[in-house]
Structure formats: C-alpha cells, structure tokens
Amino acid sequence: MLVIIPSAGIGSRLDLHTKYFNKSMIQLGDTPVISKIIDSYPKQTRFIVITGYQGVHIKEYLRLVYPKRNIKIINVDLFEGPGSGLSYTLSKSLKFINEPFFFHANDTIFTDKKFYSNIKKDTMFLHKANCDTMKFATVEINKINKKIHNKLNYLRKDFFNYTGVGFIKDFKKFKKLIKNYKVNEGELSYFKSLDPNKINFKFIKNWFDIGSKETKEKAEDF
C-alpha cells in the first residue's frame, strides 16, 4: 500500500500556529498530526511525504520516530507565491508513483478504523455533517446528478464535504494529468476527470480537520 502525504504549504489559515512549524507538526495532545496520519495505516505501508515550508522539522521528526518505516521524503523548492500549489508539489513525486495509492491531506485525521480496507476502485472519502461549500471541496449527490466541486463562493448545506483523502487507482492517468496541469487543483483534477458514477464515494464517521483555526480547535479534544 502506498500513501502520499503532501506537506509543503505554509498553512496560512492557521496564522501563528504555523509561524515556526509546518501544520503537519501541530500537536493534538502529545502527538503531531503527521503521526496520527501515519499511525492510522498498517505498519507495512509505504509513504511518500512531500515537504517544503519548515520541512526540516518534518524530516528530522520522521527519521527519529519512524526509523524502520518505509517513508520517502521529497523536498520541494517552491511552496508559496506564484507557481506554487498542490499540483506543483505533487509533480515532484511522480517518478516515485508506480502503483495505485491513497492521497492523504496533511490536515486530515480519521478515527474510523481500517478506513482503507477493501478499497479497490477510485474512491473519495466524504463526510455528511456540517457541509460548508465555501471552506471545502464538496460532492453533490442526488437522484439526478453527481458532481465534484471545488470551494464555491456560496453556501450549500446539502452537499458532502470531501475530506482530503482519496484512493487513486489509475496512477498513470494521474501522473499524466499532474505533469501537464493547467489548473492547480491537485488530486481533484484526477477525480474530476472521471465519470462520477464510477467513483466510490465512501462516508467517514469521524473526520477531524486541522487546516484552519476554527476546525483545529474542534479537533483538539480528539
């Protein structure tokens, strides 16, 4: 099993929380977020962690805490300003992707056990509660339509939040899309290229997002 964790961005929505640390190193209790992510997968999992902003801290931490785990660390040189973004970050990992994989955002934590089990087809992990189309990418699902949306400039409560975790089956197509990206949509560009009726939309019971000050505060009780 391969899991890719992009962790290059500056975490601007967290303000002072990320002044000195990458947001994946923010602690919930005694444990950094990145450990909660890594520990949610089987020990034999292979990880690719893509660093940039304050990446030295991540690299040192992972080598100290997980000396026997299969973790490939890639550093990107551009993580803020023009030209930066998730698609650029992912483009630096393409030569190491040679199998289907899980994409796992570095600000997403699940408490659902073995959420990765029996995933064989393209999958987006969704959450039903507190939909916010202005803060999150969402999926519209009804009897007539299935559609993936980026953040919108209006609020809809009848869509489902995309948690930032997905399983990408056709890794060759993904690599081609990211290599030739025109719009900086990251992994969403892959899912939006698919027939939505062929995507597995899996609902997560417990999702904690630490990507903003408000959602981080809710996750601190986890």
Please give the residue ranges for each predicted region.
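Conserved N-terminal catalytic core of the sugar/cofactor nucleotidyltransferase
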Residues: L2-I5, R13, Q27, T31-P100
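Short alpha-helical oligomerization interface
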Residues: K19-S24
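Conserved core of the sugar-phosphate nucleotidyltransferase
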Residues: F110-E185
